[in-house]
Design a protein with these regions (language model features):
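Internal alpha-helical scaffold of NAD(P)-dependent oxidoreductase catalytic cores
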Residues: 103, 107-112, 128-166, 175-233, ...
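Glycine-rich Rossmann-fold phosphate-binding loop(s) that bind the pyrophosphate
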Residues: 15-16
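Rossmann-like NAD(P)(H) cofactor-binding subdomain of soluble oxidoreductases
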Residues: 22-25, 43-49, 56-131, 135, ...
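Hydrophobic, well-ordered beta-alpha structural blocks that scaffold small-molecule cofactor pockets
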Residues: 2-9, 20-29, 37
């Protein structure tokens, strides 16, 4: 079979921090994908290499087999209504924090939906990405989504009931790491092993506090801390700069940081992030 016959068309709506990373990671190697992107801020779509800009959101949805929704939670409902008539028979993947597959299905109908939560370390292909599937998605759909996000780092399939907790741990967790390093006396270019293990212990405890089993908590904590440190070392940015990058206004990480900067407790910060994710989901 020729490549032309096997290339999958993937449309990405939203070309911000995460949408652009997903697009570039899927396009830089020969993964047999044709990547289309759309963003309401047209200036973001200039000088694209190996990625095609769609003229509008309807064109992207109509021409894609897989649609990745890389938009903020508050923008999702409008986007879903815009693409509804184009998604029959297609796979929809959402990275919007807090919004369930049930919520998306309520607007789109009986559509195959996968929910995904990557983190900022996707920039260096070391993301810790959690995934779950909706009512109409198949195991094969989940495998395909896992394959796509494997190019961004490690993946973990979890129950949807734990996705908001994953948002608080692996999604917002890098900010806790950056804040810890930012307020430490050691050189951020030479992070001591005892500090690394201290951060892992704190994040693992926070994960268990939110209901993860011991093995999953350890997996998420170790990978999130290691990936965050790796991002810091590879980008050579200050911890404060990376913390600000991962802290979106009104998001789960901002809620966590408001608590962490006051009492320094990772468990309390993670609870605040979870509470914010649940608040975003209350429309369900």
């Amino acid at each position: 079979m020729t490549k032309q016959n096997t290339r999958q068309k993937i449309g990405i709506i939203g070309f911000g921090n995460m949408g652009s990373v997903i697009a570039h990671r899927l396009s830089v190697q020969d993964h047999n994908y044709d990547i289309f992107v759309f963003d309401k801020e047209k200036e973001k779509l200039s000088n694209l290499l190996g990625i095609k800009a769609s003229k509008d959101i309807h064109d992207l949805a109509a021409s894609s087999e897989i649609i990745i929704l890389a938009v903020k939670p508050q923008d999702l409902d409008h986007i879903l209504k815009e693409i509804k008539k184009y998604v029959s028979g297609k796979l929809v993947i959402s990275i919007a924090a807090g919004l369930s597959t049930k919520h998306i299905e309520r607007i789109l109908g009986a559509i195959r939906v996968i929910r995904v939560m990557p983190n900022i370390a996707a920039k260096i292909a070391e993301s810790v990405t959690c995934l779950c599937k909706g009512m109409y998605a198949t195991d094969e759909d989940l495998d395909l989504a896992q394959e796509l996000f494997y190019y961004l780092g490690t993946t973990r399939i979890i129950e949807e009931g734990m996705m908001n907790a994953a948002t608080a741990i692996s999604g917002s967790g890098p900010a806790y790491v950056f804040y810890f390093i930012e307020n430490s006396t050691f050189d951020q270019a030479n992070i001591p092993e005892h500090a690394r293990h201290d951060m892992m212990r704190r994040l693992e405890k926070a994960a268990e506090d939110l209901g993860f089993d011991t093995e999953t908590a350890a997996f998420l904590a170790a990978n999130t801390v290691n990936a965050s440190i790796s991002l810091l070392l590879k980008t050579k940015l200050l911890a404060q700069e990376l913390r600000k990058q991962v802290t979106s206004k009104g998001g789960t990480t901002e809620a966590a940081m408001e608590v962490l900067t006051k009492d320094g407790l990772w468990e309390e910060a993670a609870r605040a992030a979870l509470k914010r994710a649940e608040a975003l989901a209350r429309r369900d």
